[in-house]
Amino acid sequence: MQGLAFLAALACWRCISLTCGATGALPTTATTITRSATQLINGRTNLSIELEFNGTSFFLNWQNLLNVITEPALTELWTSAEVAEDLRVTLKKRQSLFFPNKTVVISGDGHRYTCEVPTSSQTYNITKGFNYSALPGHLGGFGINARLVLGDIFASKWSLFARDTPEYRVFYPMNVMAVKFSISIGNNESGVALYGVVSEDFVVVTLHNRSKEANETASHLLFGLPDSLPSLKGHATYDELTFARNAKYALVAILPKDSYQTLLTENYTRIFLNMTESTPLEFTRTIQTRIVSIEARRACAAQEAAPDIFLVLFQMLVAHFLVARGIAEHRFVEVDCVCRQYAELYFLRRISRLCMPTFTTVGYNHTTLGAVAATQIARVSATKLASLPRSSQETVLAMVQLGARDGAVPSSILEGIAMVVEHMYTAYTYVYTLGDTERKLMLDIHTVLTDSCPPKDSGVSEKLLRTYLMFTSMCTNIELGEMIARFSKPDSLNIYRAFSPCFLGLRYDLHPAKLRAEAPQSSALTRTAVARGTSGFAELLHALHLDSLNLIPAINCSKITADKIIATVPLPHVTYIISSEALSNAVVYEVSEIFLKSAMFISAIKPDCSGFNFSQIDRHIPIVYNISTPRRGCPLCDSVIMSYDESDGLQSLMYVTNERVQTNLFLDKSPFFDNNNLHIHYLWLRDNGTVVEIRGMYRRRAASALFLILSFIGFSGVIYFLYRLFSILY
């Protein structure tokens, strides 16, 4: 504290000089300051400092100061204070800053932290050598000591705001336990660099334009405890730079006067309210949504989007700060709640890295929390996970993200996920739409599966392949049209409404041209809106789509390149590869013979690459008529119904997992068996390697009606011709 008082004295002397025209001189070298300090101590220990311009006064004890601060440190403080700087230079620095008209003061201190341990819950003081298996339950419904969790977050001490970094000349150097973030946009000569720091007490984010003089163009956003913000040098004070504050936190912006308008694109008071009135979980999800919106607009790497990314990075760091601050303010924190918050922050960093590949983070570890989570998920069986309420399933999946070391997710969890997805899929086939709740769970499953290593158990691998096939079945032409419509309005999206089962599907044909063909034909969507929706959905699909080809064993049986594959259909005993060229060593069905304008082949391959007991030469697809809902048993189980358009190719796939799905396949809401569209065809991909075309009575009736219409037109033409002939003759 004595050091801070010393800094304040130096800083305020500069303020007095600027505002009151003081001409007094202070010592200008380290030797002089040390000698002057000695003389002060010999004369009197306490120095009284009075600031005439605002009536502030305080005492500085030099003896205590020198007991705490060494001579080299005192020299550094003196040099950093730039006390000998020409006052005209200091005045120029001040005049280069933008100052808000006033500080908006908001009553109260915002939200209450949500992860307090209920009085009825047990708490555990985890220390070195703690036996984690002694922790109860499997859902983290107990408290652990907060300081240990906080120590994992802030495990590294950093030297910040060094004097040789011009963009930080507004701050005094300091050492602090912190987490560091950075993003680089553009090249090293003319690009933009963004740096961020999160400590237990504050957040600082800096925007540095490399193409200009850093001291004049660096911009800073700060959030935190007002009395603990980094010390400023004398040409400005926090009271002048604070945009909004409440009883607990303050939001400060240090912006250049010549460019502040490009950075003040949003209302900072509203941003402050969003930060302080939302729970950390709600606020984190808001930032996730914003990053998805930036990704959808393809603005992640655009240098002109740097002001937006500056603000997003600031909000992202504040989300991390709010979680850490909540932990810091309590002796114990509830495990399940903190795991949920950590999982959301992890996903936030992940999508930020997808959007901005140069995004880096150093710190914010979860060693203790990961050990606790690992113990909890080890007790969750597959059937238990499948039977838990939705909120508890989300808790388990959050703990998996923290507790699965090196991506090694327990087999019981993977099997449980397969069961959860099958239940969700069966429910989906009653309505053929997905709500936000289902999409939220899918997002959690996506995070776990895309981070996990392939399971060693072949049985679990096969179940996961069936799971991916169920996600593929929910990626219908209806779903594609819905997502294009949503992404046509990226600013109205939320993170869950933006998630699609297509991200976990086995379709590889969803390029922009294909998506445009599936766009809704509605007057509500203009051509511009369709283009925006197609581009946005394609961007996110490219970023989040599961890299699933390496999970399909049968792919190794052929030398086909990935760009030729349209979709894969892994059934229990055979894998179908739908592609634009025929595969070797497979039973090949050429779909192009059935009216399709572009080539499409369906190749049947066994997972172990062995042959079939029937001819593997190119085969014609037989036709079955009059298929309808089976009255008994499940003849369609473990097979797939595929629909395709004559012009646009593959539309939808439907994996029949049980009798209920089989029955729901024929509902009016089903995307299959359209009575009114003769351009849509349906194939039945069976588990024995045979493919059959399905044509129902609806097709025969339509053909008969068409024949009657053509016959009537022809007959009418003949009558008219005879009438004209007789008119001429008679």
UniProtKB/Swiss-Prot annotation:
Residues carrying sugar: 46, 54, 101, 125, 131, 188, 209, 215, 267, 274, 365, 556, 613, 626, 688
Organism lineage string: Viruses, Duplodnaviria, Heunggongvirae, Peploviricota, Herviviricetes
Annotated spans, Interaction with gL: 190-254
Signal sequence bounds: 1-21
Record topology, Virion surface segments: 22-706
Gene3D superfamilies given in the database record: Herpesvirus glycoprotein H, C-terminal domain, Herpesvirus glycoprotein H, domain D-II
Chief site of localization: virion
Originating organism: Human herpesvirus 8 type P (isolate GK18) (HHV-8)
GO biological process, one term: fusion of virus membrane with host plasma membrane
Annotated keywords: Fusion of virus membrane with host cell membrane, Fusion of virus membrane with host membrane, Glycoprotein, Host cell membrane, Host endosome, Host membrane, Membrane, Sialic acid, Signal, Transmembrane, Transmembrane helix, Viral envelope protein, Viral penetration into host cytoplasm, Virion, Virus entry into host cell
Protein name: Envelope glycoprotein H
Subunit architecture: Interacts with glycoprotein L (gL); this interaction is necessary for the correct processing and cell surface expression of gH. The heterodimer gH/gL seems to interact with gB trimers during fusion. When in complex with gL, interacts with host EPHA2; this interaction triggers EPHA2 phosphorylation and endocytosis allowing KSHV entry.
Disulphide bridges, residue numbers: none
